[in-house]
Amino acid sequence: KKFRDKSIILVGFGGGFRRTELISIDYEDLEFVPEGLKIAIKRSKTDQYGEGMIKGIPYFNDKNYCPVLNLKKWLEISKIKSGPIFRRFSKGLSLTEKRLTDQSVVLLMKEYLNLAGIENKNFAGHSLRSGFATVAAESGADERSIMAMTGHKTTQMVRRYIREANIFKNNA
């Protein structure tokens, strides 16, 4: 379970995913390439016509926090070769064929924040996506690059993340 949960958190953050996008990923949507991982998103909140998009997650320098390597490890341990990559466990902790719910992502986020001693009332499944956008802005990514990864259709929300990321920069 901990390998699945770590993969959910790292892939969710590394790809700037909404929790509904994250739980909808199937094994068939994955393509491991030399640069990292391509994930086909079939539909999202702002893509109601199902045009889809491809998200690319590069390898991270720190292997412990690399979404690509951790997902490979989860798939190897779980022996998942088709269908949902993020599945429920039974009460006896056997892996089922059933896809996790988006609420499960919220609950596991809160569980791990609690274990880390972090007040979790201000965190939810969306925190992975907003965290990605904020860190990308702090690292100097422009709003179009952030929007391409997160799937935002307008600059309004992305600019909010950039403003939050820049509040301490160039502070007079």
Regions found by a protein language model. Give the residues of each.
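Residue-level marker of regulatory loop/turn positions in helix-turn-helix DNA-binding domains and
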Residues: 1, 63, 101, 125-126
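Catalytic-site neighborhood detector that most strongly recognizes the C-terminal catalytic loop/helix
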Residues: 150-172
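Short pre-functional
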Residues: 3-23, 134-138
